[in-house]
Each structure stands twice: as C-alpha cells, then as structure tokens.
C-alpha cells in the first residue's frame, strides 16, 4: 500500500484509538487551559531548537537556551547565521521536546512566531537580560567569577508566538492547537 497524507480527522481518530488502548482519556483543553499548560511546560525546560530561514531559502537550526515570559520566548545569543536570517525574514519556529523512549511520555511544543532582535541600545535587550538574570547568577555561582561580555557582542531574540501545537500524552493532550488572536 502506498503512503498517503492523512486528514486531520483521520489522524485524530487514530490518536483517540491509541489513547484508548493506553487507558488515557483524551482531553481537549480550552484556549486558556492550553495556555496554562504550555506556560507551565516552558517554565520547566531551558533548551530549544530555533529555526530561521533567510532569503536564500536555506533553513538554519540552532540549539539555544531560552527563558519565557508567559508564552513569549527570549533567547540570549552572541551571533551566528540566525541573526542574518532574522534580518531578512523575521519568521521563526521553535521546537521544545522532552526526550522519551515511549509514546505515552511524549511531551513538547512546536511554536511559530515573529522574531525581534534587540541589541544593548534597545529597551527589549534590558528586559531580556533581566529575565536571564537568575541563569547568569547561577552560572556565576558555578564558576566563581562574574560574567562579563564584550560591549556589543550579545543580543536578545524575542519570539512572539502566532501558532503553537502542544503534546502531553500522559495527560491525554495530543496535537492541541493554539493561535494568537
């Protein structure tokens, strides 16, 4: 039998059957409940894969640390191709997942959004740095000296989500879609 694309309805039916076999009740959270679930998950993880694409159409993916403020993601970085891409195209995608070996334990979120880059002269940079302060303090404690970055080296990327898809199979949440208003 040849492979084919399944409709959303067909995929939902297959998912429901799988969850039923695992004795997990499927849940369909409201937008507000889904936002709370996603924020809770974002607050518990720290690394994400950030995907960007410039005018040349060549995608770039970078594994970076992040902090969140609600559903908004902040990334602290020194440079790289991702910044060139974001100058040409402010659309970004983020993948965050919990590594599992079983279907039952799958948990993660895929985010599409608009990215903004802030340098030291921007208000957004100071705000992002404040959000990263606990991480910097912890790192300074680990290495025993203050962290200092050369002026102009570091930037903050803020990704404001437009669409998200969330999974938390143990809770019965699968393929839960969120869209900005």
Where in this protein do the model-derived segments appear?
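Short Pro/Gly-enriched beta-strand edge/turn motifs at strand-loop
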Residues: 44-49, 137-141
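Short, basic/aromatic recognition patches
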Residues: 23-47
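Short beta-strand segments
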Residues: 45-79, 86, 93-98, 107
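Short, charge-rich binding segments
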Residues: 84-86, 102-105, 148-149
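Short acidic (Asp/Glu) patches
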Residues: 77-80, 93-99, 133-145
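Charged, gly/pro-rich active-site loop segments
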Residues: 1-30, 107-181
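Short, surface-exposed beta-strand-loop junctions and turns on beta-sheet-rich folds
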Residues: 81-84, 101, 172-174
């Amino acid at each position: 039998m040849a492979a084919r694309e399944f409709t959303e309805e067909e995929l939902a039916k297959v998912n429901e059957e799988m969850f039923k076999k695992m004795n997990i009740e499927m849940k369909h959270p409201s937008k507000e409940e889904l936002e709370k679930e996603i924020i809770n998950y974002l607050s518990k993880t720290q690394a994400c894969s950030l995907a960007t694409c410039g005018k040349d159409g060549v995608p770039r993916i970078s594994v970076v640390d992040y902090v969140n403020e609600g559903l908004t993601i902040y990334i602290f970085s020194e440079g790289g191709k991702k910044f060139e891409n974001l100058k040409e195209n402010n659309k970004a995608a983020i993948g965050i997942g919990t590594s599992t070996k079983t279907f039952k334990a799958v948990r993660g979120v895929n985010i599409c959004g608009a990215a903004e880059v802030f340098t030291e002269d921007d208000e957004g940079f100071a705000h992002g740095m404040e959000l990263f302060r606990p991480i910097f303090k912890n790192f300074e404690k680990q290495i025993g000296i203050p962290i200092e970055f050369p002026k102009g080296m570091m930037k903050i990327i803020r990704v404001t989500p437009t669409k998200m898809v969330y999974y938390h199979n143990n809770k019965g949440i699968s393929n839960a879609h969120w869209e900005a208003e």
